[in-house]
Amino acid sequence: MLSKQIPLGIYEKALPAGECWLERLQLAKKLGFDFVEMSVDETDDRLSRLDWSREQRLALVNAIVETGVRVPSMCLSAHRRFPLGSEDDAVRAQGLEIMRKAIQFAQDVGIRVIQLAGYDVYYQEANNETRRRFRDGLKESVEMASRAQVTLAMEIMDYPLMNSISKALGYAHYLNNPWFQLYPDIGNLSAWDNDVQMELQAGIGHIVAVHVKDTKPGVFKNVPFGEGVVDFERCFETLKQSGYCGPYLIEMWSETAEDPAAEVAKARDWVKARMAKAGMVEAA
């Protein structure tokens, strides 16, 4: 793994649904991926993972050891439902408790990075108070993460509050904590009116991982690779030239497809071809 120039992973929701992590990691290995990113979204099923028993957590660790496929990151999108910026104190408290549990879970199973959704609120109307509560919630969250040595990394979103690296850097400077970094999504970044290459260069010292997907203006999910607006080769070239050596994660939602593995293999080959054109050579 450490000899590979490009650590390449796949999002959990790209693979067949289910709770057997040994099978999921075995499939990811068969498909040639180095790691899988876990999803803890707003559904009760995936939220319940944060209450796994010691035995369930150990089963995940054992699956990682057995397959050699890591689970180094978690996409924590549960805060759509329980936002840190909520003006309802009970909802906000639930959001902070989810954060605490996620950090503890990460510490237990070896997850290094928790990707955060940059929403002050999602299903409610945002205002100055929701943004203030969100900032305060992030500050409290980063304090918890610091004690656990777990990195919280902000995603560049499909939402105006956090739709550029420049905006996310504002939060990084505000929090001024090494355990808060950035996890850009080049699809989301490209779907807005951003100077994508400048944005990537500006954030390079704070980027801990990169989501890879295609998008169109106003369409942030399920755009087939090559049918959107993302200039993948330029993005990969910029990241390479800027000195980025971290992981790339192909983000897809093909878990309910007729043949998820075939969809993933097709996307993997497409992305790797663009990486090769950008001069990113895989080590054998």
From Swiss-Prot:
One of its GO terms (molecular function) is intramolecular oxidoreductase activity, interconverting aldoses and ketoses. The keyword Transcription does not apply. It is an enzyme of class 5 (isomerase). It comes from the Bacteria. Pathway: Cofactor degradation; L-ascorbate degradation; D-xylulose 5-phosphate from L-ascorbate: step 3/4. InterPro entries: L-Ru-5P_3-Epase, L-Ru-5P_3-Epase_Enterobacteria, Sugar_Epim/Isomerase, Xyl_isomerase-like_sf, Xyl_isomerase-like_TIM-brl. Its EC number is 5.1.3.22. It catalyses: L-ribulose 5-phosphate = L-xylulose 5-phosphate. Gene3D superfamilies: Divalent-metal-dependent TIM barrel enzymes. Induction: Induced by L-ascorbate. Repressed by UlaR. GO terms for biological process: L-ascorbic acid catabolic process. Keywords: Isomerase. Catalyzes the isomerization of L-xylulose-5-phosphate to L-ribulose-5-phosphate. Is involved in the anaerobic L-ascorbate utilization. Belongs to the L-ribulose-5-phosphate 3-epimerase family. This is L-ribulose-5-phosphate 3-epimerase UlaE. It comes from Escherichia coli (strain SMS-3-5 / SECEC).
